Amino acid sequence: MRCLPVFVILLLLTASGPSVDAKVHLKTKGDGPLSSFRDNAKSTLQRLQDKSTCCGYRMCVPCG
């Protein structure tokens, strides 16, 4: 029975404490946006396609 007032006081202190902004997000090194990853993949594929032009229908062979 002695624990009940302590529990109530702690509950009131917790509820009246300063609010924390839940949307604060600290970015780390690996938290880049997914769109930049897609852009990098597209540019890499475009660069590889520009370096070797496909001459055949079934096999992609670099032309001279």
Swiss-Prot record:
Residues bearing the modification Cysteine amide: C63
Tissue-specific expression: Expressed by the venom duct.
Disulfide bonds: C54-C55, C54-C60, C54-C63, C55-C60, C55-C63, C60-C63
One GO CC term on file: extracellular region
Keywords: Amidation, Disulfide bond, Neurotoxin, Secreted, Signal, Toxin
Subcellular location: Secreted
Molecular function in Gene Ontology: toxin activity
InterPro entries in UniProt: T-conotoxin
Signal sequence bounds: 1-22
Free-text comment about domains: The cysteine framework is I (CC-C-C). Alpha4/2 pattern.
Family classification: Belongs to the conotoxin T superfamily.
Listed name of the protein: Chi-conotoxin PnID
Organismal lineage: Eukaryota, Metazoa, Spiralia, Lophotrochozoa, Mollusca
